[in-house]
């Protein structure tokens, strides 16, 4: 599971590859599938578990963003090939390009004046103000919030029904602020949602802190009731091209066109069906039988690509601006944190992960090494150029022995020289302590399981034990620890389809800053915090590079093979419109090709 909401980007060369698959739009009229006689599309997808456009902790799985985006148009969508400033995808956005003041502190944004909610009410800056009031009075409940970052140190001014401004106390890099901060702003239907119960009349409750907290609690509570999604009137007030018609948790959902959608990009199909599967095998069986229109091939089955293509599918690799990593739990409550907090142990562990071989043999070359917190440049993807640590078991063994460990291959490596000296095991580690870790990983992904079988075997050769527990939701099973939350994990993997996808600007304030919202392992380093902050302020390219170089070496996580977001299999009679490497999907642009179309 990918933790990001929905945002990926890669180099233009990848787009060229995608374009060669013949997937750009070639028809704008509705057309029935020649195979089914129906104007609907069935796609493989985990069922989303969140519908409220304000993200919540514990509900950040990747499918949520695409689902919400279909119902609620974003203030800003992005496109990696866009020539619009800040890579904004204007046709899919409710906002126009921000105007930045000369002092760099005020961002003035004008909304489209033709956008409407599905009940006919005009989209306006009141919907922006509503979002602002809910978020600023419930920051501790918002998954995207980190203290000291947006909306802290910023103020909102409503200028008219379609214009607002955000003013910051300090100057930031405009690209970072627009692409990574203002992109979190959502328009919410104040006229339909500003209440605290289903039968209460809408009012301006959000304009007081108490009212905003009560409204937020009501909306968040309703969003947690997944079984009610399709029948709850709240979620029928949308401004996107789609409306929800059915929803069954863990099984799937159906979207139908919003008949009152205001945009020119009205859906060309009559129904979009999200079908959930229990795992890779079940999904791939559906692809092989031709029962699904838009699915994927598991990496372990990539060698069956030709057979899939013979069933009438186009197959292509869908990459992204992503990294994949194994989260490390630095929290004192974690069973193995005393080991993880020793940098030399992290270094030894990284040197036991053979990323090139795992990428080739396990992932069938549908993954490539991750070297640090910033995605690899396009010309280095597939290499370890720039990686601080290469696969080197001998160096890993020497690190352990040089720090007081008795390495017992295929046995149990233990500390025999405790203490805090340069040649000792380190703080908190006692004589006889065995080097072992508890791993939480994702179930249902064949390549992930095979990869960790190999990694566990490799670690075992140096007497390091890893106990693996595979669960459907590894993020939910490895939340940040505290004194009140039982803490049973040391390592957590949720990167079967990459761990994290970045917006246009790949900074790390949400991942690796102290107390960051997605810093599950509670990594904290003052130098990292300093470099992260500098990367958000400076317009110099070396600021982001300096941040990357430090964390690549310091190992807040272990860098892992980074899978393509998806090995996509799509019926060759289904036109997906223009596919962009951001990973965003726009189902309203999809259409079945008419007879004779190519």
PLM regions: where:
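Extracellular/periplasmic solute-recognition and catalytic clefts
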Residues: 135-145, 155-158, 245-260, 273-337, ...
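Extracytoplasmic/peripheral linker and loop segments enriched in polar/acidic and small residues
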Residues: 346-347, 359, 465-482, 505-572, ...
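Append "and occasionally in soluble cytosolic enzymes with long acidic Gly/Pro-rich linkers
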Residues: 236, 256, 340-457, 598
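Surface-exposed binding/hinge segments that line
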Residues: 147-219
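Bacterial signal peptide processing site
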Residues: 27-29
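C-terminal motif of bacterial Sec signal peptides marking the signal peptidase cleavage site
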Residues: 22-25
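Aromatic- and charge-enriched surface segment that lines or borders ligand/interaction sites
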Residues: 96-142, 159, 165-167, 175, ...
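N-terminal lobe/hinge region of extracytoplasmic solute-binding protein
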Residues: 44-102, 133, 237
């Amino acid at each position: 599971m990918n933790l990001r909401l929905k945002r990926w980007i890669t180099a233009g060369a990848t787009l060229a590859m995608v374009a060669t698959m013949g997937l750009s739009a070639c028809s704008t009229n509705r057309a029935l599938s020649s195979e089914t006689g129906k104007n609907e599309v069935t796609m493989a997808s985990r069922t989303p578990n969140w519908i409220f456009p304000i993200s919540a902790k514990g509900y950040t799985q990747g499918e949520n963003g695409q689902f919400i985006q279909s119902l609620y148009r974003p203030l800003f969508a992005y496109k990696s090939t866009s020539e619009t400033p800040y890579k904004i995808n204007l046709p899919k956005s409710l906002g126009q390009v921000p105007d930045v003041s000369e002092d760099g502190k005020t961002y003035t944004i004008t909304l489209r004046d033709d956008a409407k909610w599905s009940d006919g009410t005009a989209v306006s800056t009141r919907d922006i103000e509503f979002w602002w009031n809910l978020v600023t009075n419930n920051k501790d409940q918002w998954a995207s919030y980190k203290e000291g970052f947006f909306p802290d140190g910023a103020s909102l001014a409503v200028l008219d029904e379609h214009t607002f401004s955000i003013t910051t106390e300090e100057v930031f890099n405009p690209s970072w602020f627009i692409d990574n901060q203002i992109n979190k702003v959502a328009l919410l239907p104040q006229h339909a949602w500003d209440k605290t119960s289903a039968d209460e009349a809408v009012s301006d409750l959000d304009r007081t802190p108490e009212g905003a907290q009560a409204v937020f609690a009501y909306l968040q509570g309703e969003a947690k009731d997944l079984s009610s999604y399709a029948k709850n009137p709240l979620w029928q007030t949308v401004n996107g091209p789609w409306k929800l018609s059915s929803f069954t948790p863990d099984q799937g959902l159906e979207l139908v066109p919003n008949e009152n959608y205001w945009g020119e990009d009205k859906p060309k199909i009559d129904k979009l069906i999200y079908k959930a599967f229990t795992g890779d095998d079940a999904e791939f069986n559906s692809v092989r039988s031709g029962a699904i229109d838009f699915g994927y091939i598991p990496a372990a089955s990539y060698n069956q690509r030709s057979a899939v293509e013979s069933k009438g599918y186009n197959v292509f690799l869908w990459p992204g601006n992503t990294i994949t990593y194994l989260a490390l739990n630095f929290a004192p409550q974690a069973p193995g944190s005393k080991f993880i907090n020793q940098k030399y142990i992290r270094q030894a562990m990284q040197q036991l992960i053979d990323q090139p071989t795992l990428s080739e043999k396990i992932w069938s070359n549908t993954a490539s090494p991750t070297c640090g917190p910033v995605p690899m440049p396009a010309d280095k993807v597939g290499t370890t150029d720039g990686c601080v640590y290469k696969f080197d078991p001998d160096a890993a063994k020497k690190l352990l022995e040089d720090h007081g460990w008795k390495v017992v291959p295929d046995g149990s490596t233990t500390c025999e020289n405790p203490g805090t000296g340069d040649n000792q095991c380190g703080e908190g580690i006692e004589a006889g302590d065995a080097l072992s870790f508890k791993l939480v990983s994702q179930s249902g992904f064949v390549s992930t399981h095979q990869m960790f079988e190999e990694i566990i075997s490799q670690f075992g050769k140096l007497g390091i034990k890893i106990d693996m527990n595979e669960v459907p939701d590894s993020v939910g099973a490895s939340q940040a620890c505290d004194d009140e939350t039982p803490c049973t994990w040391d390592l957590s993997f949720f990167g079967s389809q990459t761990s994290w996808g970045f917006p246009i600007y790949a900074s790390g304030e949400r991942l690796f800053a102290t107390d960051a919202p997605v810093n599950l392992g509670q990594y904290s380093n003052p130098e990292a915090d300093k470099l992260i902050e500098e990367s958000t302020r400076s317009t110099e390219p070396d600021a982001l590079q300096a941040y990357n170089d430090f964390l690549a070496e310091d190992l807040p996580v272990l860098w892992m093979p980074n899978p393509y977001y998806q090995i996509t299999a799509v019926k060759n009679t289904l036109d997906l419109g223009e596919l962009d490497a951001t990973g965003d999907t726009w189902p309203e642009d999809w259409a079945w090709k008419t007879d004779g179309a190519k």
